[in-house]
Amino acid sequence: MSSHNRDVYDGRTFHSRYQWVLAVGLVAVLLATSGCGWIFHKAQKDLTVVVKFVGTDSLNFDGERAQAVEVKAFVLTDSHRFMSADPRILFDPSFEPTLYEDFQKKDVVSSATAHLSPLETESAEIVIPYAKADKMDLEFAAIANFFHPPSGKRERVVFKLRKKPKQTITINVGKDWVAQD
């Protein structure tokens, strides 16, 4: 092999190596910018809902004084059973165990309970697994166990839950009503 041919051969080797490195680099850049999860996998995060329960000065008023009340918050897949249920089922599992278990298994994703006094604020955190939050529309529901149950389902509230990684929901509880702030 002559000296001239060796230089050409070495030049071609360098050129083909350069093309290979350039091709690998280009593929890496394309994968990184295309949102491909192979390189930059984004961790799936659970949703966190911080619930602030706020009691008014007339909370659970019995005619003489305001009284403490138990308040429950739920993240639900469906609110129909919640809206039609007797409140005693939601607060006392032994009242109708079969209905309570059915509600818990079919509708409840997560829940929290607070014992609220007049002019008091309680907070609770509800964590919603990413797998549930990502695949379905969820609803937020709250109910209070009043001394005198109100008419017209004013003791409960339901609304669509936003799909935000972290959010705060304020639930106001009055004499005989529950409302989202």
Regions found by a protein language model. Give the residues of each.
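Bacterial signal peptide processing site
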Residues: G37-F40
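Bacterial N-terminal signal peptides that target proteins for export
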Residues: H4-A23
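C-terminal motif of bacterial Sec signal peptides marking the signal peptidase cleavage site
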Residues: A32-G35
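Short coil-to-beta strand junction motifs in C2/discoidin
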Residues: G63-E70
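Glycine-rich, aromatic-bearing surface loops/beta-hairpins
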Residues: F147-D181
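Short, surface-exposed ligand- or partner-binding patches at beta-edge/loop junctions that are enriched
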Residues: A133-P150, R154
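Tryptophan-paired
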Residues: I89-D134, H148
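Short amphipathic, basic-aromatic surface patches that mediate peripheral association
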Residues: V51-D62, D78
